[in-house]
């Protein structure tokens, strides 16, 4: 069917047809006017972002709502805004970004922005479709299985230390038998004691959940992210080189720094220090984790909020 005939067909439908259509989609769909205020927010957008339509209609998407960032943690709302690019080019603008969920963690999405024209051919609005491509799509079943086997950290809803220990033992066996490389990232929250002292343990627990969900949402489905200790997390990354491990570590670090917990009067954010290392053939479970932890402590010594993959410097 041609575009002209399709337009004629739409003109003959009920006024709420498009709204019903968009609300039937699992993908997020929203529309902005020329001032970049949100004028429509579908049910898919509610499910993916956690924000109900009533909380976002009439607001700018940069008003501490989605706040798109790239994999380097750079906010796109000013210089790289998909809506601005679409209004200027009057064409579809696809891309990837990390949006801010209502709970404060970062979520990877594929985004496609497109112009909406009036009858005179002028762009009067911008539509955006965003698709969640995080492993959390598979999480409900996985979380139930982990909880059944007592391998789930109930406070953060990610894998617990027992699961991570079993996972690392399996990865070491695979590496030695099949030469499959993998790396470990040891993560510690910076200044967590001060945060708890200032805002209370309940807020501190929310920050830990924010970090846990950012990690779990931004690794591949065959990688593993979990809670190691009170304010420590561990990520195992499969089939990876040293350079790629450094890139993944810094991406996760930057995404955490661009996340926040929302209180009534302020937004609480934090940074993390990381140690990243590839597993070696001579490694035991203990030696691998110890080396990653020592590299994390090296990041602390260098000033925090960084990744160390060697003791000569930090990335």
Question: Model-derived features: where do they sit?
Answer:
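Signal-transducing coiled-coil linker helices
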Residues: 9-12, 16-27, 105-155, 162-173, ...
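PAS/PAS-like sensory domain cap-loop motif
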Residues: 34, 43-60
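Conserved hydrophobic beta-strand signature of PAS-family and PAS-like sensory domains
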Residues: 38-39
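Terminal output helix/cap of sensory domains in signal transduction proteins
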Residues: 64-103
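PAS and PAS-like sensory/regulatory domains
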Residues: 93-95, 102, 107-111, 268-273
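Conserved long alpha-helical elements within nucleotide-processing catalytic cores of c-di-GMP signaling
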Residues: 160-183, 190-217, 226-230, 234-235, ...
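A short pre-motif secondary-structure segment
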Residues: 224-227, 268
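Catalytic-core segments of nucleotide cyclases and related cyclic-nucleotide turnover enzymes
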Residues: 246, 264, 278-315
């Amino acid at each position: 069917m041609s575009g002209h005939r399709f337009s004629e067909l739409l003109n003959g439908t009920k006024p709420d047809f498009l709204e019903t259509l968009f609300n039937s989609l699992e993908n997020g769909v929203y529309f902005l006017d020329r001032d970049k205020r949100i004028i429509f927010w579908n049910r898919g957008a509610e499910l993916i972002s956690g924000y109900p339509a009533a909380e976002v209609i009439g607001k700018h998407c940069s008003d501490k709502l989605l706040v798109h960032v790239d994999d380097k943690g750079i906010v796109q709302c000013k210089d790289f805004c998909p809506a601005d690019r679409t209004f200027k080019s009057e064409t579809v603008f696809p891309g990837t970004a990390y949006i801010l969920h209502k709970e404060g963690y970062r979520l990877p999405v594929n985004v496609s922005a497109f112009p909406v024209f009036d009858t005179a051919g002028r762009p009067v609005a911008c539509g955006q479709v965003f698709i969640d491509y995080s492993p959390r799509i598979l999480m409900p079943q996985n979380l139930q299985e982990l909880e059944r086997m007592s391998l789930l950290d109930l406070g953060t809803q990610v894998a617990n230390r027992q699961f991570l220990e079993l996972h690392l033992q399996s990865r070491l066996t695979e590496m030695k038998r099949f030469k499959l490389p993998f790396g470990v990232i040891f993560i510690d929250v910076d200044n967590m004691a001060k945060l708890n002292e200032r805002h209370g343990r309940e807020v501190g627990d929310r920050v830990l959940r924010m970090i846990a969900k950012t990690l779990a949402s931004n690794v591949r489905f065959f990688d593993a992210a979990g809670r190691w200790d009170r304010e420590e997390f561990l990520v195992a990354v499969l089939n990876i080189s040293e350079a790629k491990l450094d890139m993944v570590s810094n991406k996760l670090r930057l995404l955490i720094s661009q996340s926040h917990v929302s209180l009534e009067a302020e937004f609480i954010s934090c940074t993390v220090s990381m140690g990243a290392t590839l597993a070696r053939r001579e490694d035991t479970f203990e030696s691998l984790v110890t080396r990653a932890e020592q590299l994390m402590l090296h990041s602390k010594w260098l000033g925090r909020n960084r990744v160390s993959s060697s003791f000569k410097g930090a990335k």
